[in-house]
Structures are given as structure tokens and as C-alpha cells.
Amino acid sequence: MTHKREIQGNVVKISGDKTASIVVERRVMHPRYHKVVKRFKKYLVHDERNELKVGDEIVAIECRPLSKTKSYRLKSVVVGVK
């Protein structure tokens, strides 16, 4: 069994049925100015039970491609919105 990549991010949009868009933040050192800057990337996550809401913090795990741009599925909700 292979080790699947996990990403942690915040839900920013519910993109249709069983799909949520999350934004993942990473911090990198700027090559010239040596300052830590934030970089963001959006991923589509498969939500089988339609349980996610905008603002939730989640952990997603890599899986086989479910569509052209969707290759992650929901693993757990870390912090839910009330």
C-alpha cells in the first residue's frame, strides 16, 4: 500500500454536488529578500455526504482522479463552522 498525500485547508466554496473547493496555504522563503511569504493553491475535494460548509477546516487525502481536476477526497473535518 502506498502512502497518500494529505493536505489541510479551508473550504472557500461549495462547487456543485459532492464537491468543495479548498484553499491550502504554504509558507516559502523569498529567494532574494529572505522573507517568509504565503503562497496559496486551490484544490477540489470530493465530499460524498455533502457535509462541508464554507469556513470548515478539513484534511483531504489523495485518491485516483475523480474528474478532470478533482483528485482528493475528504478524510476528516478538523474545525467545523456552527
Swiss-Prot record:
Biological source species: Sulfurimonas denitrificans (strain ATCC 33889 / DSM 1251) (Thiomicrospira denitrificans (strain ATCC 33889 / DSM 1251))
GO function terms (MF aspect): rRNA binding; structural constituent of ribosome
Protein name: Small ribosomal subunit protein uS17
UniProt-listed NCBIfam families: PRK05610.1, uS17_bact
Family statement drawn from the similarity comment of this UniProt entry: Belongs to the universal ribosomal protein uS17 family.
Family matches, as PROSITE patterns: RIBOSOMAL_S17
Keyword rRNA-binding belongs to the record: yes
Subunit structure: Part of the 30S ribosomal subunit.
InterPro entries: NA-bd_OB-fold, Ribosomal_uS17, Ribosomal_uS17_bact/chlr, Ribosomal_uS17_CS
Keyword set includes Glycoprotein: no
Function: One of the primary rRNA binding proteins, it binds specifically to the 5'-end of 16S ribosomal RNA.
Keywords associated with the record: Ribonucleoprotein, Ribosomal protein, RNA-binding, rRNA-binding
Source organism, top-level taxon: Bacteria
GO cellular component annotations of the record: cytosolic small ribosomal subunit
GO biological process: translation
